[in-house]
């Protein structure tokens, strides 16, 4: 039976540990928000790109809360309705499920970035509402330029804020343009969005966006 399970891919590291005692260091109700049953995010769950910020089309509106995560996982709110399916997921060989303070952390898909891939010591992620889904902003900016010299100029200008990522899929693309991924050494997703917007306005940049995730759809 096909099921749609609410999930968020959170691309941030705030705490070194992933145990129950270290996942939340603030009262849970101040940093966790469970969308209502009629939330559009529950209707279609998949990775998402194409949102802009500031003066771009499809502006994002800051949602109600910020939170910190102990790694890069899919976070499922624990409810009785989902308990049976999550228990079944936990028995599958390609699934890793951990119950942490009323939440299940599930890594089961190639779309997920594992908890071993840490990105910063403390990075606060705001929860943004796009249409029709919400968006999680990751501390990485992806930039398209016409030549490799533009990459060097960007790194020089934003020294201390950006470094080139060691991820694959960079350099000259088949279409003759260049694509680069920059890790952000910032404190908040708001700063990452603002920096991407600033880079986007450069004459030597075709486009620039933060790496981001919307919910994921599972057929289970």
Over which residues does each language-model region extend?
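C-terminal motif of bacterial Sec signal peptides marking the signal peptidase cleavage site
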Residues: 15-17
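Sec-dependent signal peptide recognition
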Residues: 2-8
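Sec-dependent signal peptide cleavage junction
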Residues: 19-21
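Residue-level signal for mature regions of secreted extracellular proteins and peptides
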Residues: 11-12
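Low-complexity intrinsically disordered segments
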Residues: 1-2, 27
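Primarily auto-inhibitory N-terminal propeptides
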Residues: 25-220
């Amino acid at each position: 039976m096909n099921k749609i399970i609410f999930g968020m891919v959170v691309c941030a590291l705030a705490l070194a540990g992933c145990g129950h005692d270290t996942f939340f260091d603030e009262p849970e109700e101040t940093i966790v928000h469970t969308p209502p049953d009629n939330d559009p995010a529950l209707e279609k769950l998949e990775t998402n790109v194409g949102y802009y910020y500031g003066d771009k089309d499809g502006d994002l509106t800051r949602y109600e809360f910020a939170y910190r995560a102990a790694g890069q996982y899919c976070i499922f709110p624990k409810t009785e309705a989902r308990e049976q399916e999550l228990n079944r997921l936990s028995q599958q060989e390609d699934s890793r499920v951990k119950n942490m303070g009323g939440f299940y952390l599930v890594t089961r898909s190639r779309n997920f970035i594992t908890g071993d891939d840490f990105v910063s010591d403390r990075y606060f992620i705001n929860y943004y509402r796009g249409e029709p889904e919400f968006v999680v902003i990751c501390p990485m900016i992806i930039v398209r330029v016409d030549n490799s010299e533009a990459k060097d100029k960007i790194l020089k200008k934003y020294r201390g804020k950006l470094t080139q990522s060691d991820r694959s899929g960079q350099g000259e693309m088949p279409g003759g343009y260049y694509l680069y991924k920059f890790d952000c050494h910032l404190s908040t997703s708001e700063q990452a969005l603002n920096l991407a917007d600033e880079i986007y306005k450069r004459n030597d940049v075709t486009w620039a966006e933060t790496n981001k995730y919307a919910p994921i759809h599972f057929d289970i």
